[in-house]
Each structure stands twice: as C-alpha cells, then as structure tokens.
C-alpha cells in the first residue's frame, strides 16, 4: 500500500494538469509553429515557464487504482501486476486466463 500522502499528491497533480492542459497545448503550438514570429515564440516560452511545474503531464505517475502501488502498472487494467495476478487467480477479471502453450 502506497503512502496516502503520495496518492493524494498525485491526484492533486492530476487536477493541476487538467486545469492547465488547454493553455499549455496552445503555447506549445505557438512555439512549434513555423508561422509564428520569434517574439511570439519568446513570449509563449516565457509564459510556459511561468506555469507551475506540476502543470506538466510528465510529472504524473500511473498508480494502481486499488492501493496506489506505483510500480508494475498495467495500463490495460489500471492495476499493478500484483493486483492483476490476484484478481485473475480469483476469477474476478472476466476474459483473462493464465497463459498456456
């Protein structure tokens, strides 16, 4: 089980990323666009730098939905490998079977 504070911090970051996502995308488009002038690029870059660090999506951590485990995360299920294994053995994940060949 992950620390409650780490799980809460990650959720707080997720909210901040969501709040700033649209504006960040606009600024990045201005920076990348060959049609924008150098002054516009500098202004967009400085505004992007003024935003909070936690507004960047790369600072998010994928965590197990059940207990918040940060490692061994499987995107398909939103769970860690340990939790997936437990649920598969219990038969709680429909359509998933142990591999055999």
From Swiss-Prot:
List, alphabetically, the GO terms of the cellular component aspect.
small ribosomal subunit
**What's a Pfam family in this record?**
Ribosomal_S14
Single GO biological process annotation from the record: translation
What InterPro entries does its record include? Answer: Ribosomal_uS14, Ribosomal_uS14_bac/plastid
Instruction: Keywords in alphabetical order, please.
Output: Ribonucleoprotein, Ribosomal protein, RNA-binding, rRNA-binding
Presence of keyword RNA-binding: yes
GO molecular-function annotation terms?
A: rRNA binding; structural constituent of ribosome
Residue ranges of the region described as Disordered: 31-59
Subunit architecture: Part of the 30S ribosomal subunit. Contacts proteins S3 and S10.
Assigned protein family: Belongs to the universal ribosomal protein uS14 family.
Q: What does this protein do?
A: Binds 16S rRNA, required for the assembly of 30S particles and may also be responsible for determining the conformation of the 16S rRNA at the A site.
The name of this protein is Small ribosomal subunit protein uS14A
Species the sequence originates in: Mycobacteroides abscessus (strain ATCC 19977 / DSM 44196 / CCUG 20993 / CIP 104536 / JCM 13569 / NCTC 13031 / TMC 1543 / L948)
């Amino acid at each position: 089980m992950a620390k409650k504070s780490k799980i809460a911090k990650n959720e707080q970051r997720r909210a901040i990323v969501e709040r700033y996502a649209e504006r960040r995308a606009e600024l990045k488009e201005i920076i990348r666009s060959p049609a924008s002038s150098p002054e516009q690029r500098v202004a967009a870059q400085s505004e992007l730098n003024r935003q909070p660090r936690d507004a960047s999506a790369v600072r998010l951590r994928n965590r197990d939905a059940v207990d918040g485990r940060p490692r061994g995360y499987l995107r398909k299920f939103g769970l860690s490998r340990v939790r997936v294994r437990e649920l598969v053995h219990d038969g709680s994940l429909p359509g998933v079977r142990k591999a055999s060949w």
